[in-house]
Amino acid sequence: MPDGADPRIESPFLRELHAYWLSRRGGRAFPRRSDFEPLSIPAVLPHLILIAVERGATTRFRVRLSGTFVDSVFRRTGTGRYLDEAPINIRHPWRLEPYHAVSTEGRIDVSRTRYVDDEDRRFDYERLLLPLAVDDDRRVDMIVGALSFAEPIVTPGVPFSARGT
């Protein structure tokens, strides 16, 4: 395992994202956004999410970039949306806690979860969230992450052969 690798990360491309993030830190706790070039990790791009931390009366998380594979799984474009407006996060606001922890504590978050959408499609994924700074080294202004989906994504009532997996 490379120096600094997190043993909790199972997905190969999440490990690749983490290794790249570590390489961009320099001597800082986390990299600046300007040091982080998503095109340098092309295998991760379809699975990537880049989220702006917007602080005001409350802290909100706006998706600045959502990878094509992530959008295809969730069946909508994530870019431009606020995480707290997603139906599942309205019903289960605790799902935003990892984003708050990353933005306030500057630590990484590795998790595995099962997602059930409004159409009762169920899928499991591993998620990695990593802090980025825009202006200084102590304040998290952006979160970069990626989702690694387990196969198959289950759609009730659709035969396995018709799922295209």
Q: How should each PLM-predicted stretch be described?
A:
Residues M1-A86, P93-T165:
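Intrinsically disordered, low-complexity terminal regulatory regions
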